[in-house]
C-alpha cells in the first residue's frame, strides 16, 4: 500500500506540473490569449450582473477578490514569460492551482445562487447543504489564492538559482 501510494504521489505531482506548464506555455498565449480572455469575460460579466444580488452578498466578494488575483497573476506570468520562458514556467504550478480554485469558486457561487432560488422546494435540505458547502469553500479554501499570489509574484528565481549540485551536497 505504501509503495503504491508513493508511486501515485509521483505521478500526481508530475502530471500537475505538466498540465501547469501546458497552461502557461501553450494555452495562455494561444490565439493571443483569446482562450483565457473568453473565460475571464464570462466570470467578469457574471460578477457585474450579480454584484448587488442579495442572495450572494456573503460570497460574491470572495469570488471578486480571487478573480482579481487571477487576472493580476495572468498578466504577470504573460509579461514575464514573453521575455524569459523560465520566468513564466517557474510559477506555473501555483498558477494552475489558483486558476482551479478561482474556477471552482465561480461554479460554487453559481450553485449558491441557484440553491437560494430553490430553497422553498427543499424538503430534504439538499439546497441548504449546497449553500453551506459552497460557503465553506469560499470562506476556508479559496483564501489560499492569497498565498499562491505571493508565490507567483516572487517569480522563478527560487527555482532558477537552485543548482543541481545543491541536491547532492544536501545528502553528503
Residue ranges and their predicted role:
Residues 1-25, 93-106:
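Conserved phosphate/anionic-ligand binding catalytic regions in large, soluble enzymes, centered on
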Residues 27-31, 42-172:
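C-terminal amphipathic alpha-helical interaction region
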Residues 5, 9-19, 30-34, 38-43, ...:
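Structured mid-domain segments that build the active-site/substrate or prosthetic-cofactor binding neighborhood
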Amino acid at each position: 500500500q505504501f509503495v503504491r501510494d508513493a508511486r501515485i504521489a509521483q505521478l500526481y505531482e508530475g502530471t500537475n506540473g505538466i498540465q501547469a506548464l501546458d497552461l502557461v506555455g501553450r494555452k495562455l498565449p494561444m490565439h493571443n490569449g483569446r482562450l483565457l480572455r473568453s473565460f475571464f469575460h464570462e466570470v467578469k460579466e457574471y460578477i457585474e450582473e450579480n454584484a448587488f444580488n442579495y442572495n450572494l452578498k456573503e460570497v460574491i466578494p470572495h469570488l471578486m477578490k480571487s478573480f482579481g488575483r487571477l487576472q493580476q497573476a495572468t498578466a504577470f506570468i504573460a509579461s514575464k514569460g514573453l521575455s524569459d520562458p523560465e520566468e513564466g514556467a517557474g510559477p506555473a504550478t501555483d498558477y494552475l492551482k489558483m486558476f482551479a480554485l478561482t474556477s471552482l469558486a465561480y461554479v460554487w457561487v453559481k450553485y449558491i445562487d441557484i440553491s437560494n432560488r430553490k430553497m422553498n422546494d427543499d424538503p430534504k435540505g439538499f439546497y441548504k447543504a449546497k449553500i453551506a458547502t459552497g460557503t465553506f469553500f469560499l470562506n476556508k479554501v479559496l483564501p489560499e489564492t492569497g498565498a499562491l499570489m505571493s508565490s507567483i509574484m516572487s517569480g522563478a528565481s527560487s527555482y532558477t538559482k537552485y543548482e543541481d549540485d545543491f541536491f547532492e551536497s544536501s545528502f553528503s
